[in-house]
C-alpha cells in the first residue's frame, strides 16, 4: 500500500515541475490472449529467475558480505591494526559512525542500523545478511525469535523499525536495478536524478513516520524532529495542490535533446 501510494503521490508532485510538463500522451498496450501456461514455460521461467538470483547471490551479495565480514572483523585496538575483539572498534564501526547522524531524524541513527540501511543499496537481500553479522545471529533461535528481538530492541523502537522498513522499501533499488534504469533512460543525469529522488523521498517518508508516529505513541516528545516532519508534510501537500507549471513550445524539443545525449 505504501509503495503504490508513493507512486501516485510522486507522479502528481513531479508533474507540477516544468521539466516534467507536457501534453498527456495515450498509452496503449496490446495484450496477448490468456492461456494456461505449459509446464515447459513454467519451469523455464523458474529456471531463469532462480539462476539469476543464484548468480546475484554468488557475486554481488557474496562480495558485499565478504567486505562486511572483513571490515567488521578488523580494525584498530591498542593502537595497532588487528582482528578486533570488540565490533565497536572495527573499520565498519568507524565508517558507520560517520554515516549514522544522517539517519537520526528517521529513527535509526546508530552505526549498525545505518550500515544495514546503506547495504540495502547493494542488494535488498543484503540487509538480512548485514543484520546477521552486526548482531551476531548465529546458531538456532527460538520459534518466536526472542533472541533476535532482544538484540534489535537496543537500536530500534517500534516506530523506528517501521521507519527503517519504509526507508528500505522506498529508497533506490539494488545495483542491478540501477543499471537497468541507466540502460532504459540512456542518460546519466536522468539516472542520477531518479536515484536521488527515490532516496530523498524515502528519507522524508521515514522521517515523517518516525517523528509523527513517535509523537502519537509517546515514544517521542515534541521537538526539532517533529518540526522538520511537519515541514516535510507541508511541502508534500504544497506540491500536491499547487498548479502545474506551464509548458512552452520548446520543452518537448529540449527533452528530446537531453534524451538523445
Name the predicted role of every residue range.
Residues 65-199:
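Extended, low-charge hydrophobic alpha-helical regions
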Residues 28-37, 54, 109, 122:
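Generic, ordered loop/turn and secondary-structure boundary motif
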Residues 5, 58-62, 122, 126:
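Residue-level signal for the membrane-embedded core of alpha-helical transmembrane segments
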